UniProtKB/Swiss-Prot annotation:
Lineage start: Bacteria, Pseudomonadati, Pseudomonadota, Gammaproteobacteria, Alteromonadales
Name recorded for this polypeptide: UvrABC system protein C
Segments forming domain GIY-YIG: 15-93
InterPro entries linked to this entry: GIY-YIG_endonuc (IPR000305), GIY-YIG_endonuc_sf (IPR035901), GIY-YIG_UvrC_Cho (IPR047296), Hlx-hairpin-Hlx_DNA-bd_motif (IPR003583), RuvA_2-like (IPR010994), UVR_dom (IPR001943), UVR_dom_sf (IPR036876), UvrABC_protein_C (IPR050066)
This protein's GO CC annotations: cytoplasm; excinuclease repair complex
Gene3D superfamilies, sorted: 5' to 3' exonuclease, C-terminal subdomain, GIY-YIG endonuclease, UVR domain, UvrC, RNAse H endonuclease domain
A single GO molecular function term of this UniProt record: DNA binding
Pfam family, one: UVR
Name of encoding gene: uvrC
Subcellular location: Cytoplasm
GO BP: any one term: nucleotide-excision repair
UniProt function note: The UvrABC repair system catalyzes the recognition and processing of DNA lesions. UvrC both incises the 5' and 3' sides of the lesion. The N-terminal half is responsible for the 3' incision and the C-terminal half is responsible for the 5' incision.
Sorted UniProt keywords: Cytoplasm, DNA damage, DNA excision, DNA repair, Excision nuclease, SOS response
Domain UVR: 202-237
Sequence similarity: Belongs to the UvrC family.
Length: 607
């Protein structure tokens, strides 16, 4: 046990509701909990007869406890989840994927647009959702585009149009930007979209049937056929999405445990339709119970800041959890409507729960199968490179066009695969164009010269290139000041540059590592190399495009940095500037009629 004097501390502890934070010797929060009676709850950790190994390990690391009193247990629950999100304590069960849920946005413009939206609701308009994933929103937008010809383009693109775009030719937009549709007809389609997104698709079909019949009576058979197609698509979508039963708004939470991995599957039902589903794999301390895992998940999922819109009126649980009444009260309070949590054993709700449980188990199986494949690749790579362990690998690549706009990339892989949060790009400057060796040295300097956290020193560094690049990397590491030295491996392409024919170089290229083309370890190296290459090329293209955009406008006398920025922002990038006619250019703030003529003539003389 630590030096923490729990006896003296407990004497001062209040019996009111509140939250407690346990800290270790580094003053880091290692556990956050809440209690209706703080003194009783915190005292329970320091009993002499604790049998739970997880609690014993936790207590052995406690060096201090901080408490915050609250008025009610509900307030304590809300504060607890905010602190868990803030500190990510290692002994708490953590929900790792806590991004805000996406919505469909219908803007309030004269000609409203449909758009994907995630985050704060600063844009004026109507928000529909939430949806379980970005893919669910994209699929819904794609389907609606086929049925309702409402624009989905950005405003800057919309304002810059002088003729219809490809979406109009595909009959997926009615081109209000160039007056191919009347305001009245466009508004009618927007009303249909609004009804459809609020679960009133039957009303939309009824309205469309009336419209089709009226068009037929007026012998407008082209319009009648167009409306008929809309009705058929709507009915097809209804069949795919509809569910039996009167479930207007319900979340079904499935749970499964297999081989040490826990999966929680969330099935979202809104407006009598299954919006979609998603499986979560919370980070769980050893020996956590199923009730603890589910309770922690529900709190972090529904009580996260900005999560009010995702709270369903009815939440179906796979089993009873402790303090479900407190959680229900908290959800009711923040959503300002009655929220019920229940366990069901019969009826259609039970069938959906069975489906959610099945999905949770299936997701675990798939994840473990994928992880097994990753583990196999890592194990073979460790054996091939003769390393005891590999917890972190980095790979560098250089991208440029004829020596210009050089960009270096560094991608990071850990035991789970790509760690995209750690990816970095470096704009290479101060070297001779096309000197890949100097560019590699520049990237290594940028990456490691100010390295403070030795835990981030990789076990292996892959250099995408031959002996020259690897040799320059070894020169850099010759004066490496840290105790841990990464293994440097060059990945040289074969003469045919085909995958599977790569040569692995070590010791400055003096030695090669033979590998079969179908070896799992080689597949892992190819994955890292390809990811580094992709990331470098993407950065290079962005830089090249930015330079092209700036250089073309920089050639125009009188168009300085401020005017360039205004033109690009107002007209939606260089494509918008090029597509604009003189009248549209004159509408840009700060652009006179003479300047508009000059810009238009210069851009079009350039072809």
């Amino acid at each position: 046990m630590s030096e923490f004097d729990h006896v003296q501390f407990l004497k001062t502890l209040s019996s009111e509701p509140g939250v407690y934070c346990m800290l270790d010797s580094d003053n880091q929060v290692i556990y956050v909990g809440k209690a209706k009676h703080l003194k009783k709850r915190v005292s329970s950790y320091f009993r002499s007869n604790i049998t739970d190994s997880k609690t014993r390990v936790l207590v052995s690391n406690i060096c201090n406890v901080e408490v915050t009193l609250t008025n009610t247990e509900t307030e304590a629950l809300l504060l607890e989840n905010n602190l868990i999100k803030k500190y990510q304590p290692r002994y708490n069960i953590l929900l790792r994927d806590d991004k805000s849920y996406p919505y469909i946005l219908l803007t309030n413009h004269k000609h409203p647009r449909l758009a994907f939206h995630r985050g704060s609701r600063k844009v004026k308009g109507e928000y529909f959702g939430p949806f379980p994933s970005a893919g669910a929103v994209s699929e819904s937008l794609r389907l609606m585009q086929k049925i309702f010809p409402i624009r989905q383009c950005e405003d800057v693109y919309y304002r810059a149009r002088s003729r219809p775009c490809l979406q109009y030719q595909l009959k997926r937009c009615s081109a209000p930007c160039v007056n191919k549709v009347s305001d009245e007809d466009y508004t009618e389609q927007v009303d249909y979209v609004r009804k459809f997104l609020t679960g009133k698709s039957h009303e939309v079909i009824a309205d469309l049937i009336k419209k089709m019949e009226a068009a037929s009576q007026q012998l407008n058979f082209e319009l009648a056929a167009k409306v008929r197609d809309q009705i058929m698509l709507l009915r097809k979508m209804q069949e795919q999405q509809s569910i039996s039963g009167n479930f207007a708004e319900m979340d079904v939470v499935g749970f499964a445990h297999l081989n040490g991995l826990n999966g929680i599957h969330l099935l979202m039902i809104r407006d009598h339709k299954v919006l979609g589903s998603k499986t979560y794999f919370p980070k769980v301390p050893k020996d956590s119970s199923e009730q603890e895992i589910l309770t922690s998940f529900l709190g972090q999922y529904y009580l996260a800041p900005g999560a009010t819109g995702r709270i369903a009126k009815e939440i179906i649980l796979p089993f009873e959890i402790q303090e479900s009444d407190v959680l229900g009260q908290a959800l009711t309070q923040i959503s300002e409507r009655k929220v019920t949590l229940k366990v069901v054993t019969r009826g259609e709700r039970a069938q959906y729960l069975q489906l959610a449980n099945k999905n949770a188990l299936n997701s675990i199986t798939v994840k473990q199968s994928t992880q097994d494949s990753i583990n196999k690749r890592y194990a073979q790579l460790k054996a091939t490179l003769r390393l005891d362990d590999i917890t972190r690998m980095e790979c560098f690549d250089i991208s440029h066009t004829m020596g210009e706009n050089t960009v270096a990339s560094c991608v990071v892989f850990d035991s789970q695969g790509p760690n995209t949060k750690e990816y970095r790009r470096y704009n290479v400057t101060g070297i001779t164009g096309g000197d890949d060796y100097a560019a590699m040295e520049f990237a290594l300097n940028k990456r490691y010269n100010k390295l403070v956290d030795e835990d981030k020193i990789p076990d292996v560094i892959f250099i995408d290139g031959g002996k020259g690049q690897l040799g320059r990397a070894e020169q850099y590491f010759a004066t490496w000041p840290h105790a841990k030295m990464p293994l440097l491996v060059g990945v040289a392409k074969g003469t045919s540059r085909k995958p599977g024919l790569e040569t692995l170089l070590i010791d400055g290229g003096r030695k090669t590592i033979p590998m079969d083309s179908d070896a799992p370890a080689l597949h892992l190296i190819q994955h890292i190399r390809d990811e580094s290459h992709r990331f470098a090329i993407a950065g290079h293209r962005n830089k090249r495009q930015k330079q092209r955009t700036q250089s073309l406008l920089e050639e125009i006398n009188g168009v300085g940095a401020k005017r360039r920025q205004t033109l690009l922002k107002y007209l939606g990038g260089m494509q918008g500037v090029k597509a604009a006619n003189i009248e549209q250019l004159k509408k840009v703030p700060g652009i006179s009629p003479d300047m508009a003529d000059k810009i238009f003539n210069h851009l079009h003389d350039k072809g």
